[in-house]
Amino acid sequence: MKAVRKQDPAGSRASILEAAQELFLDRGFAGTSMSEIAKASGVTKSLIHHHFGSKEALWGSVKRRCFEAYHQQQVQLLAGQPLTPKTAKASMRIYYEHLRDNPQVLRLMWWMLLDGDDDRSNELVAELGDLGVEQIRGLQEQGVIRADLKPESILSGFLGLIHAAFTEGWMIERRDITPDGYVDEAWQMFASAVFVDPSD
Protein backbone atom coordinates (compact mmCIF):
# COMPACT_ATOMS: atom_id res chain seq x y z
CA MET A 1 0.00 0.00 0.00
CA LYS A 2 2.81 2.44 0.85
CA ALA A 3 4.65 1.66 -2.39
CA VAL A 4 1.55 2.53 -4.39
CA ARG A 5 1.11 5.81 -2.55
CA LYS A 6 4.72 6.76 -3.17
CA GLN A 7 3.94 6.52 -6.89
CA ASP A 8 0.88 8.73 -6.39
CA PRO A 9 2.10 11.99 -4.81
CA ALA A 10 -1.30 13.68 -5.00
CA GLY A 11 -3.02 10.68 -3.42
CA SER A 12 -0.40 10.46 -0.68
CA ARG A 13 -0.69 14.15 0.11
CA ALA A 14 -4.50 13.96 0.23
CA SER A 15 -4.40 10.91 2.52
CA ILE A 16 -1.96 12.63 4.87
CA LEU A 17 -4.05 15.80 5.00
CA GLU A 18 -7.24 13.84 5.65
CA ALA A 19 -5.68 11.84 8.49
CA ALA A 20 -3.93 14.87 9.96
CA GLN A 21 -7.12 16.94 9.95
CA GLU A 22 -9.07 14.21 11.72
CA LEU A 23 -6.40 13.75 14.38
CA PHE A 24 -5.66 17.44 14.89
CA LEU A 25 -9.37 18.22 15.30
CA ASP A 26 -9.77 15.35 17.74
CA ARG A 27 -6.66 15.95 19.86
CA GLY A 28 -5.23 19.33 18.94
CA PHE A 29 -1.79 20.10 17.57
CA ALA A 30 0.11 19.35 20.77
CA GLY A 31 -1.77 16.09 21.37
CA THR A 32 -1.08 14.60 17.95
CA SER A 33 2.17 12.93 16.92
CA MET A 34 3.61 12.47 13.46
CA SER A 35 3.73 8.72 14.12
CA GLU A 36 -0.03 8.70 14.67
CA ILE A 37 -0.60 10.65 11.47
CA ALA A 38 1.65 8.26 9.54
CA LYS A 39 -0.21 5.24 10.88
CA ALA A 40 -3.65 6.73 10.16
CA SER A 41 -2.72 7.76 6.62
CA GLY A 42 -0.87 4.54 5.78
CA VAL A 43 2.42 6.21 4.88
CA THR A 44 5.84 6.57 6.49
CA LYS A 45 6.88 9.55 8.59
CA SER A 46 9.59 10.26 6.04
CA LEU A 47 6.96 10.62 3.32
CA ILE A 48 5.03 13.11 5.47
CA HIS A 49 8.23 15.13 5.91
CA HIS A 50 8.83 14.91 2.16
CA HIS A 51 5.42 16.43 1.39
CA PHE A 52 5.08 18.91 4.26
CA GLY A 53 8.49 19.37 5.84
CA SER A 54 7.41 19.49 9.48
CA LYS A 55 4.50 18.94 11.82
CA GLU A 56 4.02 22.71 12.03
CA ALA A 57 3.82 23.00 8.24
CA LEU A 58 1.32 20.13 8.11
CA TRP A 59 -0.80 21.87 10.75
CA GLY A 60 -0.67 25.01 8.63
CA SER A 61 -1.85 23.06 5.59
CA VAL A 62 -4.77 21.64 7.57
CA LYS A 63 -5.78 25.13 8.69
CA ARG A 64 -5.53 26.40 5.13
CA ARG A 65 -7.65 23.50 3.91
CA CYS A 66 -10.40 24.34 6.43
CA PHE A 67 -10.54 28.00 5.43
CA GLU A 68 -10.02 27.88 1.65
CA ALA A 69 -13.66 27.83 0.55
CA TYR A 70 -14.66 30.54 3.05
CA HIS A 71 -11.72 32.72 2.01
CA GLN A 72 -12.68 32.45 -1.65
CA GLN A 73 -16.31 33.41 -0.98
CA GLN A 74 -15.39 36.43 1.12
CA VAL A 75 -12.75 37.72 -1.30
CA GLN A 76 -15.19 37.42 -4.21
CA LEU A 77 -17.75 39.43 -2.23
CA LEU A 78 -15.51 42.11 -0.74
CA ALA A 79 -12.52 42.63 -3.00
CA GLY A 80 -14.39 43.84 -6.06
CA GLN A 81 -16.71 46.40 -4.50
CA PRO A 82 -16.84 48.90 -1.64
CA LEU A 83 -18.19 47.75 1.69
CA THR A 84 -21.82 48.76 2.25
CA PRO A 85 -24.43 47.64 4.78
CA LYS A 86 -25.73 45.25 2.11
CA THR A 87 -22.36 43.62 1.39
CA ALA A 88 -21.45 43.55 5.09
CA LYS A 89 -24.65 41.67 5.89
CA ALA A 90 -23.94 39.25 3.05
CA SER A 91 -20.46 38.72 4.50
CA MET A 92 -21.97 37.98 7.91
CA ARG A 93 -24.31 35.41 6.39
CA ILE A 94 -21.45 33.73 4.53
CA TYR A 95 -19.54 33.39 7.79
CA TYR A 96 -22.56 31.99 9.61
CA GLU A 97 -23.25 29.45 6.88
CA HIS A 98 -19.60 28.41 6.73
CA LEU A 99 -19.52 27.62 10.46
CA ARG A 100 -22.93 25.95 10.31
CA ASP A 101 -22.00 23.73 7.38
CA ASN A 102 -18.43 23.03 8.54
CA PRO A 103 -18.46 22.35 12.29
CA GLN A 104 -14.86 21.17 12.05
CA VAL A 105 -13.82 24.79 11.46
CA LEU A 106 -15.18 25.89 14.83
CA ARG A 107 -13.45 22.91 16.45
CA LEU A 108 -10.22 23.93 14.75
CA MET A 109 -10.58 27.46 16.11
CA TRP A 110 -11.05 26.17 19.65
CA TRP A 111 -7.92 24.02 19.36
CA MET A 112 -5.97 27.00 18.07
CA LEU A 113 -7.11 28.97 21.10
CA LEU A 114 -6.26 26.18 23.54
CA ASP A 115 -2.86 25.60 21.93
CA GLY A 116 -2.02 29.30 21.98
CA ASP A 117 -1.93 29.40 18.19
CA ASP A 118 -2.03 32.78 16.46
CA ASP A 119 -4.69 33.07 13.75
CA ARG A 120 -2.28 35.29 11.83
CA SER A 121 -0.17 32.21 11.09
CA ASN A 122 -2.88 31.28 8.57
CA GLU A 123 -2.30 33.54 5.56
CA LEU A 124 -5.90 33.17 4.39
CA VAL A 125 -7.27 34.34 7.73
CA ALA A 126 -4.69 37.13 7.88
CA GLU A 127 -5.62 38.33 4.39
CA LEU A 128 -9.32 38.45 5.25
CA GLY A 129 -8.62 40.24 8.52
CA ASP A 130 -6.50 42.85 6.75
CA LEU A 131 -9.13 43.27 4.03
CA GLY A 132 -11.90 43.73 6.60
CA VAL A 133 -9.95 46.29 8.62
CA GLU A 134 -9.01 48.18 5.45
CA GLN A 135 -12.63 48.31 4.27
CA ILE A 136 -13.87 49.46 7.68
CA ARG A 137 -11.19 52.14 7.96
CA GLY A 138 -12.11 53.46 4.52
CA LEU A 139 -15.77 53.79 5.52
CA GLN A 140 -14.78 55.55 8.73
CA GLU A 141 -12.88 58.11 6.68
CA GLN A 142 -15.99 58.60 4.54
CA GLY A 143 -18.21 59.08 7.59
CA VAL A 144 -20.24 55.93 6.90
CA ILE A 145 -19.07 54.04 10.00
CA ARG A 146 -18.44 55.52 13.44
CA ALA A 147 -14.90 56.83 13.67
CA ASP A 148 -14.67 56.64 17.47
CA LEU A 149 -14.23 52.85 17.38
CA LYS A 150 -11.10 51.03 16.31
CA PRO A 151 -11.65 49.12 13.04
CA GLU A 152 -10.13 46.01 14.62
CA SER A 153 -12.70 46.17 17.43
CA ILE A 154 -15.53 46.58 14.93
CA LEU A 155 -14.37 43.50 13.02
CA SER A 156 -14.04 41.52 16.26
CA GLY A 157 -17.61 42.42 17.19
CA PHE A 158 -18.83 41.42 13.74
CA LEU A 159 -17.20 37.98 14.02
CA GLY A 160 -18.16 37.55 17.67
CA LEU A 161 -21.87 37.88 16.99
CA ILE A 162 -21.67 34.89 14.65
CA HIS A 163 -19.43 32.86 16.96
CA ALA A 164 -22.02 33.31 19.69
CA ALA A 165 -24.64 31.48 17.64
CA PHE A 166 -22.54 28.32 17.95
CA THR A 167 -20.88 28.72 21.35
CA GLU A 168 -23.57 30.10 23.65
CA GLY A 169 -26.19 27.38 23.18
CA TRP A 170 -25.25 25.71 26.47
CA MET A 171 -26.21 28.92 28.28
CA ILE A 172 -29.08 30.35 26.24
CA GLU A 173 -31.79 28.19 24.73
CA ARG A 174 -33.27 29.78 21.63
CA ARG A 175 -36.39 27.90 20.57
CA ASP A 176 -38.14 30.73 18.82
CA ILE A 177 -35.65 31.74 16.14
CA THR A 178 -34.45 30.22 12.89
CA PRO A 179 -30.85 30.39 11.66
CA ASP A 180 -31.86 33.06 9.14
CA GLY A 181 -33.63 34.91 11.90
CA TYR A 182 -30.50 34.86 14.04
CA VAL A 183 -28.38 36.36 11.28
CA ASP A 184 -31.00 39.07 10.74
CA GLU A 185 -31.00 39.94 14.45
CA ALA A 186 -27.21 39.83 14.68
CA TRP A 187 -27.01 42.16 11.71
CA GLN A 188 -29.51 44.59 13.23
CA MET A 189 -27.45 44.76 16.43
CA PHE A 190 -24.19 45.25 14.55
CA ALA A 191 -25.46 47.76 12.00
CA SER A 192 -27.25 49.93 14.55
CA ALA A 193 -24.08 50.03 16.65
CA VAL A 194 -21.51 50.94 13.99
CA PHE A 195 -23.12 52.40 10.84
CA VAL A 196 -24.06 56.06 10.88
CA ASP A 197 -27.03 55.18 8.64
CA PRO A 198 -27.55 51.38 8.62
CA SER A 199 -30.28 51.67 5.98
CA ASP A 200 -27.85 52.66 3.20
Locations of the language-model features?
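Helix-turn-helix
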Residues: 11, 15, 19, 23-57, ...
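Helix-loop "lid/cap" segments that line or gate small-molecule binding pockets
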Residues: 93-100, 110-115, 189-194
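Hydrophobic alpha-helical connector segments
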Residues: 75-103, 151-158, 200
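Hydrophobic/aromatic-rich alpha-helical bundle segments in the mid-to-C-terminal region
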Residues: 106-107, 111, 122, 126, ...
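Amphipathic, non-transmembrane alpha-helical scaffold segments
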Residues: 17, 59, 63, 67, ...
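N-terminal intrinsically disordered/low-complexity leader segments
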Residues: 1-11, 18, 199-200
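Amphipathic alpha-helical linker/stalk segments
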Residues: 60-91, 132, 138
